[in-house]
């Protein structure tokens, strides 16, 4: 079995566990010592990362039914290390009957092959996807690179345009 195929199988287990609300199945895809840099949340490292992830996902699965669609753009393998990147489209249906919420995130993961030959995610980072634009378009400057005054001016300009 090819290593790329093995990563695809592990990624499918990730998706299937997410969609089933299977916390143990979801956590099984992650290394015991990992890094989580999920958008909109503090970063966590090592054993704390998996513990915090467990708490977050327990709450999420209690409050919502989740439907995760994974689009893998590429998987690159280098011996016992690999990375993949793509999109996660997540629809959350509140269990209390509220309206569903759908988000699309760009993600990047690194994988390590452990001593049992299993591929585990040891680094995860994502951010909100944005609409594609042509290179010649009036591309926005990422807010992370803007001084606070520029952000404020940009927010005011956007508010006037709405």
Language model regions located:
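Juxtamembrane/interface motifs at transmembrane-helix termini
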Residues: 45-49, 104-105, 139-144
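Short beta-strand edge/turn micro-motifs at domain boundaries
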Residues: 104-138
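Short glycine/acidic-enriched loop and turn motifs that connect beta-strands
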Residues: 90-91
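A short, structured loop/turn motif at beta-sheet edges
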Residues: 75-82, 98, 111-118
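A solvent-exposed, acidic/Ser-Thr-rich amphipathic alpha-helical stretch
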Residues: 2-10, 23-80, 87, 102
